[in-house]
Every structure is written in structure tokens, then in C-alpha cells.
């Protein structure tokens, strides 16, 4: 079922939104937690999505466990990034997103390099899933179409789309293998008015 939570203030945190909790459905006991601020430092970026704020810095909106790789894929809308962590250790495996604003050591170690044309990064994504072949599919909200304020798209030029990426985890490359389009033109682009 659907569960809508209310954010609450905690003594040492602004909200409860930046922690993933694994719960035993039989007993209700907490089995494991992953604190996003330990995986991805809160202040490691110089640019965030246009919708981010100090109290809503990650905005997790999808969690996907991949049994083949024993990893968890998380969608951080306000990071404009999809991250993947090792299930057992919580170590960061990779980051899918535009590298602008990230420290160079993160870009070199965790980000993918595009090798296909056309190619577009996603912005403020939702509905991230890992396909059986390892591809990553998502709904790209397309807000601002950039992480850099000076390059933000005007509202009339922003669009949303479905997109599928093929990632090579070893070579650290990424290809855009599907975009919701017909005859070379997007046919399901939701424009902001």
C-alpha cells in the first residue's frame, strides 16, 4: 500500500528524509539503515537542482534493490543524480547524472562518460528502475535541463520524457538507448506552461 509520511524535526537532523530503512515486514523490526549523508556528503556539490534546499537536499523518490549486483539504486531528485550503493557495505558504487558541480575526485571515480549521440542527462528524475539487463530507466522531469543556474532552460523550453540508459560499470561509460520519441521527435514531452 501507499504510505505518506510527515517530515518531523529531529534533534540532530532537519528531517527524516535522508535515511533508508530496511524493515522486517513480519516483525516490524528495523533490520538496517543507510544514512545518505554518510554515503554522499551533504556539502560535496557546488551546484544542486533548481528545486533543492538545505532541508531537502536529496529528495529520495525511488529505491531499487538489484539482486544480481547485491546493490541498491537510489534516485536523488534534488541532486539530479541516481546513485548506486553496495547493499552490504553501503559504499558508493556509481553516480548517474550530470557531473557539473561535483568534486573532480567524485567525477573521476563514480560518474559515467557519455559515448552515444544524441545524449542528454536527466534532471530531477523520478520512477528509476533497474532493468533485467542492467539498463537504467526513469522518468526525466527535465526541470531546468541544467544544474548551472546561468544555463537553466526557460519554462517553455523545459520538457519531461521517459529515458533508458545503458551503463558499462567497468568502463564507466553511458549510452542513451531509448528516449520516448517517434520519427525522431519526442511524442510524450510534457511541457510546462
Q: How would you label these PLM feature ranges?
A:
Residues 1-193:
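Histidine-/acidic-rich catalytic cores in large beta-rich domains
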Amino acid at each position: 500500500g501507499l504510505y505518506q509520511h510527515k517530515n518531523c524535526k529531529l534533534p540532530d537532523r532537519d528531517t527524516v528524509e535522508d535515511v533508508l530503512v530496511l524493515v522486517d515486514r513480519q516483525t516490524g523490526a528495523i533490520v538496517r539503515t543507510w544514512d545518505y549523508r554518510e554515503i554522499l556528503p551533504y556539502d560535496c556539490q557546488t551546484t544542486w537542482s533548481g528545486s533543492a534546499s538545505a532541508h531537502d537536499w536529496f529528495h529520495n523518490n525511488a529505491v531499487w534493490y538489484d539482486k544480481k549486483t547485491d546493490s541498491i539504486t537510489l534516485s536523488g531528485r534534488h541532486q539530479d543524480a541516481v546513485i548506486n550503493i553496495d547493499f552490504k557495505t553501503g559504499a558508493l558504487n556509481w553516480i548517474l547524472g550530470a557531473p557539473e558541480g561535483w568534486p573532480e575526485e567524485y567525477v573521476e571515480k563514480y560518474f559515467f562518460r557519455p559515448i552515444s549521440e544524441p545524449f542528454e542527462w536527466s534532471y530531477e528524475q523520478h520512477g528509476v528502475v533497474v532493468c533485467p539487463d542492467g539498463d537504467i530507466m526513469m522518468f526525466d522531469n527535465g526541470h531546468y535541463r541544467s544544474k548551472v543556474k546561468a544555463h537553466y532552460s526557460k519554462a517553455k523550453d523545459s520538457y519531461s520524457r521517459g529515458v533508458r540508459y545503458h551503463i558499462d560499470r567497468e568502463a564507466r561509460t553511458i549510452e542513451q538507448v531509448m528516449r520516448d520519441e517517434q520519427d525522431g521527435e519526442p511524442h510524450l514531452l510534457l511541457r510546462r506552461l
